[in-house]
Amino acid sequence: MTNIRKTHPLLKIVNHSLIDLPAPSNISAWWNFGSLLGLCLMIQILTGLFLAMHYTSDTATAFSSVTHICRDVNYGWLIRYLHANGASMFFICLYMHVGRGIYYGSYTYLETWNIGIILLFAVMATAFMGYVLPWGQMSFWGATVITNLLSAIPYIGTTLVEWIWGGFSVDKATLTRFFAFHFILPFIIAALVMIHLLFLHETGSNNPSGIPSDSDKIPFHPYYTIKDVLGFLMLILLLMLLVLFSPDLLGDPDNYTPANPLNTPPHIKPEWYFLFAYAILRSIPNKLGGVLALVMSILILAIIPFLHMSKQRSMMFRPISQVLFWILVADLLTLTWIGGQPVEHPFITIGQVASILYFSIILILMPLASLIENKILKW
């Protein structure tokens, strides 16, 4: 008799995705981040669901409802901080996952890559709207500043901003709709993840060498299931260290002050995972130019596959590209630091240099390095 997992219509899908899936024998720990992102999404949906049971999306009660969750709900503080720091873990895994894709040339799977970019935008939108919900000072002013960027769009800008706000400023209507979108988006993300995996399983996984591995496959279970579980344990350990020892390490103290439209905080800044993009936005003196640079800082990922000039897929055997890649990583860390600094000398100049370097590496230097490496191969 054939095993039920191979015949049952539903179990068959699970079997082909998680059990009998042929996987390359040499994929490293950098391939763990996909499953870690799945774990993060599940943690966020579960903790978010329990938070939504106690949260009220009204300007008069939003802040106090979050306080109530932390003080009066059984383990409410734990759920709240798991959700807040879970978002940070989510973005750490996201950036590692994207970095892995760039380093090992995984972007040549165009459909998977493009769905991934849409996923990145969706997660960023969800995180932004979630940050507004506690209705602290940084929530309110962050929402005001970021939504206001849309007013830079010619002709329809102002109308568009007021349409999103549901009024003439960030108020009740804005908070209610942000809560609605923040609730629905993770489920849309989960659906997109399924499409992401569908396209991935059309081609199979890439591997560190970038060379087709059809001749050397191993079953996903038990080899990579056990490897993923190790990753899960490490992620949960790191998350628990954050939540139980310093839950506010990555947050902003200003958000413990209730939102006040009459009092602007001295430094308005987003959560740490948006700081690199915020630094790029601020480094351009023109409003529309800044907004375009902000969008392009993420959308540039869609151009990367078309700038792939190398005869090799992976960077494993491409030393010049490797150096450029790690300079890019250092540059992103620099931008993250600058995004959190006040707008004054020397931070303005450092931010502008780092922004130019970011676009130069991706658009000019990496393709050039690939062409040089192709030449070296011929010698």
From Swiss-Prot:
GO terms for molecular function: metal ion binding; ubiquinol-cytochrome-c reductase activity. Belongs to the cytochrome b family. It is a multi-pass membrane protein. This is Cytochrome b. PANTHER family: CYTOCHROME B. Heme b b566 binds at residues 97, 196. Keywords: Electron transport, Heme, Iron, Membrane, Metal-binding, Mitochondrion, Mitochondrion inner membrane, Respiratory chain, Transmembrane, Transmembrane helix, Transport, Ubiquinone. The chain crosses the membrane at residues 33-53, 77-98, 113-133, 178-198, 226-246, 288-308, 320-340, 347-367. Its main location: mitochondrion. GO terms for cellular component: mitochondrial inner membrane; respiratory chain complex III. It is found in: Mitochondrion inner membrane. It comes from Lepus californicus (Black-tailed jackrabbit). CDD domains: cytochrome_b_C (cd00290), Cytochrome_b_N (cd00284). The cytochrome bc1 complex contains 11 subunits: 3 respiratory subunits (MT-CYB, CYC1 and UQCRFS1), 2 core proteins (UQCRC1 and UQCRC2) and 6 low-molecular weight proteins (UQCRH/QCR6, UQCRB/QCR7, UQCRQ/QCR8, UQCR10/QCR9, UQCR11/QCR10 and a cleavage product of UQCRFS1). This cytochrome bc1 complex then forms a dimer.
